[in-house]
């Protein structure tokens, strides 16, 4: 019997249901060409992309001091990693190591006969990696094998932590759980190499002789281990509802930031937060001894949806940055954002200082559901956010409007330290699960892409015979400015048609024109190769607004200033 939470809650990583993954939103089938939106400044460009198949997803990514990169996730048989093929069960945990040029060095797969998942990875400077996730152990053979270690489960799902050395050998593996479902969602390392794991548990759970009991359906756990796997302390937080941690990060001072979701009233040591609606996002800070320093919350008053915090990052000044999604009007410490669609969710991005005071709050979205799943932050406070954007009319990131692609797609958005969006890129149909930022202007994005051919990451194309994981290295490059057209003019206006023309942009590959009735929110889009487009099927005696973007060879400009025209009666 599957635990109840698999049908009621959407967690950051995919949960395995039956013989397939259940995503928070189904991935689109078709994959489309990259469109990049920026002001012609520094933009991340794909250097290499690797795919991991078949039937899986890559959930976590990290790197070591030598510039090697590690990715974990879930995969089914056969486990294909470039030239390496590893036999798998229905759903196993994998860890791969690549050098900085994308050459695979090794791959390791572990698990049992049922549906196991790798959710996150952290790597120390020596190249030791710590993978967390879950193993399903409610079948006739409730075991999972990682290297020479055989783990026996306690219930439906146990949470998992495995240490690998730099050569891919399993150093130790541990699992913990209750009679119900327990999942490890995130892992991070402090400057001393101690390991922090977070996730959620139910009922009574014992970790290295320490037993804790949830107050509600699920509670948050935070565990600290030394590098040898010895438990140093175990903390819990929550209340009478479903309380789940999705992400974790350690700052340079050894403090821990966590993000997730809660219902009703949740208690973190001496601090409590109360949800405004069905469920809110939380961000909590702990010191290295496990003391809760503060907790903040944000969300809407809607009674039909939870507003989860999905990922967290930190800069060199120890500020925290979070992302997630929300419905309705969501308030975070006095700042509010309004959902742009009539249904579904929008993305939020927020920055908090070391004392827990919010510094800024931004949102992005369109009429369909849009999700923020991952965030990466550099030392100076630039942040990159990814997840997926919904199909339908275009998604708006502050001043940047994206044209509709007709399918859900991966996006990558950059914000400067003040929260000003710098650019947004659109990629293949799928979801961006994790971001790891380096200090050399590069970052890694991993996730899952849909079955099909022509999966484009900038000019790199992949072909998937089944849904599969990917990892992509991006580095900042200076691109030539792609400017919007000027001289937008409406002419030959009738009761149902109008011609929109503009001054041609040198080197343009084409143009994208958006138009809508004045006072409405939904844009319609027409593309053209010439500096002219004819709009048809307009309503008589109606005012319209229009804007035009330039399609360049490698990116798309912002839209021009809006022009207004009125059809004849």
Task: Please provide the spans of the model-predicted regions.
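Beta-strand-rich modules
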Residues: 535-554
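Bacterial N-terminal signal peptides
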Residues: 28-38
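Short S/T/G- and acidic-enriched coil/turn segments that sit immediately N-terminal to beta-strands
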Residues: 529-534
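Extracellular low-complexity, O-glycosylation-prone stalks/linkers
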Residues: 507-525
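A sequence-level/structural motif corresponding to short, flexible coil/turn segments enriched
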Residues: 40-480
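N-terminal secretory signal peptides that target proteins for export/translocation
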Residues: 1-23
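Pro/Thr/Ser/Gly-rich low-complexity, intrinsically disordered linker/stalk tracts
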Residues: 480-507, 540, 555-569
């Amino acid at each position: 019997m599957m635990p109840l939470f698999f049908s009621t809650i959407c967690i950051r990583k995919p949960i395995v249901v039956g013989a397939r993954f259940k995503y928070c939103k189904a991935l689109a089938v078709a994959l489309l060409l990259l469109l990049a939106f920026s002001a012609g400044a520094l933009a991340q460009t794909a250097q290499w992309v690797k795919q991991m198949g078949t039937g899986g997803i890559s959930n976590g990514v990290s790197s070591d001091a030598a510039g090697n990169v590690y990715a974990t996730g879930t995969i089914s048989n056969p486990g294909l990693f470039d030239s390496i093929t590893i036999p798998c069960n229905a759903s196993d945990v994998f860890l791969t190591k690549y050098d900085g040029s994308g050459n695979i060095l090794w791959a390791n797969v572990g698990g049992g006969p049922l549906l196991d998942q790798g959710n996150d990875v952290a790597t120390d400077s020596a190249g030791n990696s710590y993978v967390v996730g879950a193993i399903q152990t409610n079948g006739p053979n409730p075991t999972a094998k990682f290297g020479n270690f055989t783990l026996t489960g306690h219930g439906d799902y146990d949470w998992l932590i495995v240490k690998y050395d730099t050569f891919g050998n399993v150093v130790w593996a541990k699992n913990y759980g209750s009679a119900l479902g327990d999942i490890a969602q995130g892992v991070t390392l402090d400057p001393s190499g101690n390991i922090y794991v977070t996730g959620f548990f139910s009922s009574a759970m014992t970790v290295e002789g320490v037993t804790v009991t949830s107050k509600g359906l699920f509670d948050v756990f935070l565990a600290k281990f030394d590098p040898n796997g010895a438990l140093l302390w175990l903390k819990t937080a929550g209340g009478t509802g479903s309380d789940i941690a999705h992400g974790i990060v350690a700052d340079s001072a050894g403090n821990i930031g966590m993000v997730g979701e809660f219902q009703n009233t949740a208690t973190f040591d001496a601090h409590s937060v109360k949800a405004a609606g069905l469920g809110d996002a939380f961000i909590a800070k702990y010191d290295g001894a496990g003391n809760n320093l503060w907790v903040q919350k944000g969300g809407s008053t809607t009674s039909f949806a939870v507003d989860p915090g999905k990922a967290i990052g930190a800069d060199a000044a120890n500020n925290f940055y979070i992302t997630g999604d929300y419905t309705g009007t969501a308030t975070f410490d006095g700042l509010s954002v309004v959902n742009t669609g009539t249904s579904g969710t929008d993305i939020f991005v927020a920055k908090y200082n070391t004392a827990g005071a919010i510094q800024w709050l931004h949102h992005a979205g369109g009429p369909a559901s849009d999700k923020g799943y991952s965030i990466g932050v550099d030392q100076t406070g630039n942040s990159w956010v990814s997840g997926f954007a919904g199909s339908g009319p275009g998604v708006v990131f502050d001043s940047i409007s994206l044209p509709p692609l007709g399918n859900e797609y991966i996006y990558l958005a950059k914000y400067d330290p003040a929260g000003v969006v710098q650019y947004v890129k659109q990629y293949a149909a799928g979801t961006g699960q994790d971001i790891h930022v380096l200090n050399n202007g590069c970052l890694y994005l991993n996730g899952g892409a849909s079955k099909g051919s022509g999966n484009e990451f900038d000019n790199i194309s992949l072909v998937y015979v089944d849904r599969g994981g990917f990892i992509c290295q991006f580095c900042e490059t200076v691109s030539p400015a792609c400017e919007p057209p000027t001289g937008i003019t409406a002419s030959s206006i009738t009761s149902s048609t109008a011609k929109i023309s503009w001054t041609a942009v040198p080197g343009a590959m084409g143009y994208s024109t958006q138009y809508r009735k004045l006072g409405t929110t939904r844009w319609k889009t027409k593309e053209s190769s010439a500096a002219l487009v004819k709009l048809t099927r307009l309503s008589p005696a109606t005012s319209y607004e229009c804007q035009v973007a330039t399609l360049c060879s490698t990116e798309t400009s912002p839209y021009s200033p809006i022009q207004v025209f009125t059809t004849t009666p």
